[in-house]
């Protein structure tokens, strides 16, 4: 592989606590019933606006995004931790001279800040997220490929949800499903990823199979 794209939430970082609290705060602030925890967990992966569009009246969606991002920026992001073995895995991949990038649906400034705060920004040549022009995972992947002039056939995305796999397949890069994150492995297998990995330290060996 000439490049690896990493999803952030659920792949590199366990951000479930901060994300859950941010959604709960948003629904409380809007004075609407909170979804149950299973539903909130399903929001971890797709674009933020898509989750609110599926659960709120259209008139409240933009307000919900603003409330969520403000709370997450001020409090939620600081409740994230790296998954075990992530740093060791990144060092091993870096030792193989494989360029690493983050491609996430998370708002780009927040993604950059989170990677810096958790001490992993130094392992990545680029950290790309959503903005007004890049909403879906495929948009972020397309941008990262273009700005770095990377070959699709030698690039893979590593992620824990179907949205990572769909994004990669839409653009035409290889896909690796990981089992330690927010996604359900049985569901991931339905999307026929090129690789399946059960531990961060197995990423390199899995790619070489």
Say what each PLM segment does.
Residues 3, 137-165:
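Conserved Lys-Pro-Asp/Glu-containing loop-to-beta segment of HAD-superfamily phosphomonoesterases
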Residues 33, 120-125, 151:
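Conserved H-loop
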Residues 156-196:
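Acidic, Mg2+-coordinating phosphoryl-transfer loop and its flanking beta/alpha structural elements
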Residues 2-88:
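N-terminal helical cap/lid subdomain that shapes the substrate entry/recognition surface
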Residues 23, 89-115, 128:
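Substrate-recognition element of Asp-dependent hydrolases with the DxDx(T/V) motif
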Residues 105, 179-181, 200:
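Short secondary-structure boundary segments
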Residues 121-135:
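A short, structured active-site edge motif that brings together acidic residues
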């Amino acid at each position: 592989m000439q490049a690896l794209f990493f999803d952030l939430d659920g792949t590199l970082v366990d951000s479930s606590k901060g994300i859950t609290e941010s959604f709960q705060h948003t629904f409380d602030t809007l004075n609407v019933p909170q979804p149950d925890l299973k539903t909130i967990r399903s929001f971890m992966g797709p674009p933020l606006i898509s989750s609110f569009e599926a659960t709120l009246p259209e008139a409240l969606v933009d307000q919900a995004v603003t409330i969520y991002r403000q709370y997450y920026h001020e409090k939620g992001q600081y409740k994230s931790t790296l998954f075990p073995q992530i740093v060791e895995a990144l060092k091993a991949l870096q030792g193989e001279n494989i360029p690493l990038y983050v491609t996430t649906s998370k708002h780009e400034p927040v993604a950059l800040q989170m990677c810096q705060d958790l001490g992993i920004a130094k392992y990545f040549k680029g950290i790309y997220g959503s903005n007004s022009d890049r909403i879906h995972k495929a948009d972020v992947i397309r941008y990262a490929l273009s700005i770095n002039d990377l070959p699709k056939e030698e690039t893979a995305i590593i992620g824990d949800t179907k949205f990572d796999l769909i994004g990669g397949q839409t653009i035409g890069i290889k896909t690796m499903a990981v089992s330690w994150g927010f996604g359900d492995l049985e569901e991931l297998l339905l999307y026929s990823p090129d690789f399946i990995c059960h531990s961060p330290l197995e990423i390199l060996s899995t790619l070489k199979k």
